[in-house]
Amino acid sequence: MSEPARLISPEKRGEDLDITLRPQSLDEFTGQAEARANLKVFIEAAKNRGEALDHVLFVGPPGLGKTTLAQIMAKELGVNFRSTSGPVIAKAGDLAALLTNLEERDVLFIDEIHRLNPAVEEILYPAMEDYQLDLIIGEGPAARSVKIDLSKFTLVAATTRLGLLTTPLRDRFGIPVRLTFYTVEELELIVRRGARLMNLPMTEEGAREIARRARGTPRIAGRLLRRVRDFAEVARAEAVTREIADEALTRLLVDNVGFDQLDKRYLNMIAVNFGGGPVGIETIAAGLSEPRDAIEDIIEPYMIQQGFIQRTPRGRVLTAIAWKHLGMQPPKEMEAAQFRLFQEDD
C-alpha cells in the first residue's frame, strides 16, 4: 500500500513480532472458539496415532492469528516449525530445499499461499499427497526425472484470498479453517492480557476503548495498546483509563469505530463524488490512488462485516450506517435505489 505506516493496517510489521505478547497454547489463545476446539481434536488424534496431522488451510483477513495458530499447532504436536511465504518460494529448488530438510511430522507454514508461483505449485501436489518430490534434472535430451522421498510432514498454509487458490491445491488440504473478525469482548481480553504482560495498569473501560477501535483484529489491538502505553507513560498516568485511551487514539486519528483517514477518504469519495454508489472497485482504486488488492483485502472486509458498505453486482454502495457515521444525509432517491439494488443482489 502507499501508506505502509498506517497504524490500523492489519498487515504484519516488525513491532508485531513481539513473542512475549503471543499466546503459547490453544488454551491461552483468545477467540476463534470453534476453530480452536476442532484443532484440539485433530491434534490429539494425530498424536494418539503417531501420524502427521493432515494439511491445514487457514482462510481469513490478515491479522487474525493464522501464523500464531500455526506455531501453536507445532508446539502442541511437539514438532519443529518452519515458516516461509508464497512470494519467497520463487522456483522449484527453493521448495525442494525446504521440504527435504523437514523431519518426520514437522510443520511447514506457508503464508500467502495464493501468491505461490504456478510452477512451484505443481511440485507441491505430489509432496502433499504422496510425500514425494518429482524434479526434472538437466535440460533438453539430457533431462531426467528424479523422485525424492520426503518425511511425512504437515503443511499449514494461510490465505486472505481463497478464490485465488486453484481447485487442485485447495482440495489437498484435509482441514480447512476459516477465521473471522473478533468481537469487542474477545479483543478486550486480548488487550488486558497484553497490558498485564507489559506491567501496564489499565482499567476495564480503558481496555474496552482500545478494543472498540481495533477493527476486530488482534494485531491492530496490540499495536494500539503499544501506542496508548506511550501516551500514558509520558502523561505519567497511574493507569490507562478510557479517557487516556480516547485521547491517545483520537490524536492518532483513529476514530470511535477504528477508521482512519484512508477509510474516511474511501467513504467520503463514494458519498460525495458518487452520491453513495453504486461505484466500481477500479474507479475507487483510481480515486484513492491505492491498488485494488489493498482495497479489497485491507480496507473493505471490516467495513462490509460492520455493515458500512454493500457489495452489489453494479458496485459498492454506502449503507445507512455509513451515512450516519459521516454525519451526512443520503440523497432522497438513495433509499429506493438501494432497495432495487439489494433485490438484484438477492
UniProtKB/Swiss-Prot annotation:
Subcellular location as annotated: Cytoplasm
Cross-referenced SMART domains: AAA
Span list, region Small ATPAse domain (RuvB-S): 183-253
InterPro entries given in the database record: AAA+_ATPase, AAA_lid_4, CbxX/CfxQ, DNA_helicase_Holl-junc_RuvB, P-loop_NTPase, RuvB-like_N, RuvB_C, WH-like_DNA-bd_sf
GO cellular component, one term: Holliday junction resolvase complex
UniProt region (Head domain (RuvB-H)), positions on chain: 256-346
Subunit structure: Homohexamer. Forms an RuvA(8)-RuvB(12)-Holliday junction (HJ) complex. HJ DNA is sandwiched between 2 RuvA tetramers; dsDNA enters through RuvA and exits via RuvB. An RuvB hexamer assembles on each DNA strand where it exits the tetramer. Each RuvB hexamer is contacted by two RuvA subunits (via domain III) on 2 adjacent RuvB subunits; this complex drives branch migration. In the full resolvosome a probable DNA-RuvA(4)-RuvB(12)-RuvC(2) complex forms which resolves the HJ.
Main function: The RuvA-RuvB-RuvC complex processes Holliday junction (HJ) DNA during genetic recombination and DNA repair, while the RuvA-RuvB complex plays an important role in the rescue of blocked DNA replication forks via replication fork reversal (RFR). RuvA specifically binds to HJ cruciform DNA, conferring on it an open structure. The RuvB hexamer acts as an ATP-dependent pump, pulling dsDNA into and through the RuvAB complex. RuvB forms 2 homohexamers on either side of HJ DNA bound by 1 or 2 RuvA tetramers; 4 subunits per hexamer contact DNA at a time.
Family as reported in the entry's similarity comment: Belongs to the RuvB family.
PANTHER family named in the record: HOLLIDAY JUNCTION BRANCH MIGRATION COMPLEX SUBUNIT RUVB (PTHR42848:SF1), PTHR42848
Protein name: Holliday junction branch migration complex subunit RuvB
Gene that this polypeptide is encoded by: ruvB
